[in-house]
Amino acid sequence: MCVKGIKTETNNILIDTGMGSADLTSNIIVTPNANKLLKNLKRIGVSPRDIDIVLLSNLQKDTVGGATRMDRSGRTIPVFPRAKYIVQKSCYDEIEQGNALRISQLYDKEEVINLHKSGQLELIDGDVEILKGINAIKTGGYSPGNQVFFINSGTEKYIFLGSLIPTPLHLVDNAIPSYAYSLNDAWTAKKEIIKHGLDQGALLIFGRAREKQSGYITEKYGKLSVDFREL
């Protein structure tokens, strides 16, 4: 999984906390190891206290695992002490009310609850403009409150796909992650996001790809292809 970052005039923002870091004012930096997140932030002159916002696609382990850590007393505390962690309310509702087996397999319930207790987890409902040019779009499907992020940076448009279309291989019409909460909703949302990407000429960023993590999509004779680009 890869983490993306955005640096605006007033905010340092991360998208998911699995691995990597980025600065959209220059380029996007991708690293393959979750343990390197803080080191890569340090490399670009950013400390954990400098992070203002963490956008979370959902609350599953591979998305939110880097959001908290144990302190010396054994308490779970946020890694980014000043940040707002933003996620859909229906994602948190699933943690509290969802199928127990699914929760145990895909979530670290205690970690998420402790993050909520810290007061730093902000629950939103539906499509929300986080900041000018940065929008959270609720898709559902993969999880009840799964969200993707539309980012406008000058003339460039980006879509961070997170878990909805995790790799380029999942652009294929019937390729939906088998552990999606609703296969039908995930398929519908996927089609809508792909259409938006085509219409807007947006750069798609695949949130779980280890290689070839971003590119522009084109459609010819009903078939999609990706013009991969380095970030």
Question: What is the meaning of each model-derived region?
Answer:
Residues 64-68, 137-147:
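Active-site glycine- and acidic-residue-rich loops that bind
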Residues 20-21, 29, 35-46, 79-138, 185-201, ...:
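Metallo-beta-lactamase
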